[in-house]
Amino acid sequence: MLIMKRLLLSALAVLLCGQVVQAKKDPNAPAPTDKKEEIHWITSIDELQAKMQQNPKKVLIDMYTGWCGWCKKMDADTYTNPALVKYINNNYYAVKFDAERQDTIHFQGKDYFFAPQYKANGFAIELMKGQMTYPHTVFMLENFQNPTPIPGYRSVQEMEIFLTYFGDNMYRRRAYDEYSKNYTPRWSNGQPAPSTPVPGH
């Protein structure tokens, strides 16, 4: 019986000491966080134009709608990849644009209005060349040159190829088909390189 009491007291002492040590371990340490880097989305076209004047960069515009399920899937699956997020933030101005917004958009000296027949804003209609499918990604070079629309949901690997093709200026040296065929993905393992042609490349 005495042995049992001593064992219980010893165990209690060890437990209390452990709690004290744990409490003193790092009282000023910040609480652990799982927060990941996110894409620095721009939602104002006016802000985009101001940023372009200050520091010209390439542009990625994510054309979406509130009802588009594949848009949400792309947000969840593609635009959360850490390497992709970092590359976009370093090399692009990333824009989220609701294609169905009804306010007037002022862009490059032109006004764009909501077009009921398309159920979309004229800004989206022009950049998507009237192909109103969602999601839709539009790439632009510095100073809004050469807008290139890419329709449909895109995986991390597909977006990696598009992003680096424009972001690394490979479009100056190779046709897109050649580039995508010989590209080795670095950001993820998955499907083979996309065969979707890039308009004008």
Predicted segments, located by residue:
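A short beta-strand-turn-helix
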Residues: 40-59, 88
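Detector for the c-type heme attachment site
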Residues: 72-76
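Soluble non-cytosolic domains of exported or imported proteins
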Residues: 39-43, 58, 62, 78, ...
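Thioredoxin-like thiol-disulfide oxidoreductase module
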Residues: 82-84, 89-148, 156, 161-169
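Bacterial Sec-dependent N-terminal signal peptides
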Residues: 1-25
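Short active-site neighborhood of thiol/selenol oxidoreductases, capturing the structured segment around
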Residues: 55-69, 94
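Non-globular targeting/processing and membrane-anchoring segments
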Residues: 24-37, 141, 147-201
